[in-house]
UniProtKB/Swiss-Prot annotation:
Protein name: Elongation factor 4
UniProt topology in membrane: Peripheral membrane protein
Gene name, Swiss-Prot/TrEMBL: lepA
Reactions listed under catalytic activity: GTP + H2O = GDP + phosphate + H(+)
Function per UniProt: Required for accurate and efficient protein synthesis under certain stress conditions. May act as a fidelity factor of the translation reaction, by catalyzing a one-codon backward translocation of tRNAs on improperly translocated ribosomes. Back-translocation proceeds from a post-translocation (POST) complex to a pre-translocation (PRE) complex, thus giving elongation factor G a second chance to translocate the tRNAs correctly. Binds to ribosomes in a GTP-dependent manner.
Coiled coil ranges: none
Enzyme Commission (EC) number: 3.6.5.n1
Source organism, top-level taxon: Bacteria
Organism: Pasteurella multocida (strain Pm70)
Length: 598
């Protein structure tokens, strides 16, 4: 057991985590050169296309160190985006140490800090690694000082390597062996295994990735899931070398996968403890804190026949992605669907794409909203995650919106632009610290503004140099109103949104104009209105298509013309009272982009 090392690789987006993992696998011979490809751990098509890691992946390698011993390295490659920070904290719970990879050209960025503090809070050994030293812009000395200055860990001795060219990888492996502590645990105690991740295999059922904390797990053992009390037989178990390899035993301290023929998706929730059926452990391992979704949106299948398939797909996906929340919802405009909770907009996009690709569904998303705390006049406090759930205005004492604490790191040159952006987003500055050429800014900004397009705007005002990390801070009273969109006097529930009162006229006008472009012209006028309660704040009209009824009249009597026009007018009036307007798909998507195009 003293030769096992469990660690995660953490870093900011694009600092080279996945490439470093590739090199470690190659150096330790986990895959033959023929099977090796770039970012071999990013196995999902989506990950390859976008060039980002979404799912944390684990690998077991054997490394023969310079002291002649062979060490077993279990490592987990984690995502860097703030939306997937939950994957990172789960991976860290299974480890004793973490490699903090920092790009020697870019230096410390916001995610570097956030992930590093998560690791330190969990009492992990953090080993800094300076990557990308082959770049002409690399300045390892400056970056090492930056790490000490901003993060506060000793980095002068940090290994300098280049994951792309393979320089210094041996040193990284030696560092891992010497710096990261071996796992602690009692091989003879009752079995306790922590479920780090699960996914659904159509042939095997639920496959779980586990870390054995105490005891051992053998093939054929009877195990019990502690939260549900259900017992299962272990059919297969093994490790990833990134390929799935079967073994007969998982020893104390190891990380591996287990198949117990669990058909039920909720059979082995992530963060749960497995123990042996005959000799159960007395206590549950401390799992992970549940993350609360920050962004909610309605997802609806385009054809109502897909509803069943959509429900199953969501179930399978939520097993693999523990931070996804969903509950059934129905809308008059869109039929039956689900209200889903996500950690951020990128997360939402990814989930939607995965559903469309892996499960072959066509979906519509409604405008994303955050959770508001609403105090009603009878003193009851409710949490509202969708505009349609908001009680009528005269029943509300106050609405409180969620405030996010945003930590930004950026070069001094862009400070002015970024502050202007934060103020525009109704932000309040709480802290500002200079580190050499970098500035660390802390702002409290309403979550609704952060979630919408803050990250994109921040990147564009700072030419990509600023980085962001945010988390929920508290609820705070604000003057929020619900804007309803009415088409010919009918409210369309899927188009409603909750906005700040000052922005309401502007957002309403923008939406109405956008809808006017997208709704096809009919035989009668279509009035599109935005309203707060009964007060109309914006309106536009899609003009009717009309025949020229006077074409056949040449000169002659005006009363004849009047009669024909009058007749047309009556016909249009009758059509309008009967006709209903189909709102096309694009109109719902337009809402997502309101305010983005500037």
């Amino acid at each position: 057991m003293k030769n096992i090392r469990n660690f995660s690789i953490i870093a900011h987006i694009d600092h080279g985590k996945s490439t470093l993992s590739d090199r470690l696998i190659q150096t330790c011979g986990g895959l033959s050169d023929r099977e090796m490809e770039a970012q071999v751990l990013d196995s999902m098509d989506l990950e390859r296309e976008r060039g980002i890691t979404i799912k944390a992946q684990s690998v077991t390698l054997n490394y023969k160190a310079k002291d002649g011993e062979t060490y077993q390295l279990n490592f987990i490659d984690t995502p860097g985006h703030v939306d997937f920070s939950y994957e990172v904290s789960r991976s860290l719970a299974a480890c004793e140490g973490a490699l903090l990879v920092v790009d020697a050209g870019q230096g410390v960025e916001a995610q570097t800090l956030a992930n590093c503090y998560t690791a330190i809070e969990m009492n992990l050994e953090v080993v800094p690694i300076l990557n990308k030293i082959d770049l002409p812009a690399a300045d390892p000395e400056r970056v090492a000082e930056e790490i000490e200055d901003i993060v506060g860990i000793d980095a002068m001795e940090a290994v300098r390597c280049s994951a792309k060219t393979g320089v210094g990888i041996e040193d990284v492996l030696e560092e891992i062996v010497h710096k990261i502590p071996a796992p602690e645990g009692d091989p003879n105690a009752p079995l306790q295994a922590l479920i780090i991740d699960s996914w659904f295999d159509n042939y095997l059922g639920v496959v779980s990735l586990v870390r054995i904390k105490n005891g051992t797990l053998r093939k054929g053992d009877k195990i019990k899931v502690m939260s549900t009390g259900q017992s299962y037989n272990v059919d297969r178990l093994g490790i990833f070398t990134p390929k799935q390899v079967d073994t007969t035993i998982l020893n104390c301290g190891e990380v591996g996968w287990v198949v117990c023929a669990i058909k039920d998706i909720l059979g082995a929730p992530v963060g749960d403890t497995l123990t042996s059926h005959n000799n159960p452990a007395s206590s549950v391992l401390p799992g992970f804190k549940k993350v609360k979704p920050q962004v909610y949106a309605g997802l609806f299948p385009i054809s109502s026949d897909d509803y069943e398939a959509f429900r199953d797909a969501l179930g399978k996906l939520s097993l693999n992605d523990a931070s996804l929340f969903y509950e059934p919802e129905n809308s008059t405009a869109l039929g039956f669907g689900f209200r889903c909770g996500f950690l951020g907009l990128l997360h939402m996009e990814i989930i939607q794409e995965r559903l469309e690709r892996e499960y072959d569904l066509d979906l519509i998303t409604t405008a994303p909203t955050v959770v508001y705390e609403v105090e009603k006049t009878d003193g009851e406090v409710i949490y509202v995650d969708s505009p349609s759930k908001l009680p009528p205005l005269n029943n509300i004492t106050e609405i409180r919106e969620p405030i996010a604490e945003c930590n930004m790191l950026l070069p001094q040159t862009y400070l002015g632009n970024v502050i202007t952006l934060c103020v525009e987003k109704r932000g309040v500055q709480t802290n500002m610290v200079y580190h050499g050429n970098q500035v660390a800014l802390t702002y409290e900004i309403p979550m609704g503004e952060v979630v919408l397009d803050f990250f994109d705007r921040l990147k564009s005002t700072s030419r990509g140099y600023a980085s962001l990390d945010y988390g929920f801070k508290r609820f705070q009273a604000a003057d929020m109103v619900r804007v309803d969109i009415m088409i010919n006097g009918e409210r369309v529930d899927a188009l409603a949104l909750i906005v700040h009162k000052d922005n309401a006229p502007y957002r309403g006008r923008e939406l109405v104009e956008k809808m006017r472009e997208l709704i096809p012209r009919q035989q009668f006028d279509i009035a599109i209105q935005a309203a707060i309660g009964n007060h109309i704040i914006a309106r536009s009209t899609v003009k009717q298509l009309r025949k020229n009824v006077l074409a056949k009249c040449y000169g002659g009597d005006v009363s004849r013309k009047k009669k024909l026009l009058q007749k047309q007018k009556e016909g249009k009036k009758r059509m309008k009272s009967l006709g209903n307007v189909e709102v096309p798909q694009e109109a719902f998507l337009a809402i997502l982009h309101v305010g983005k195009d500037k």
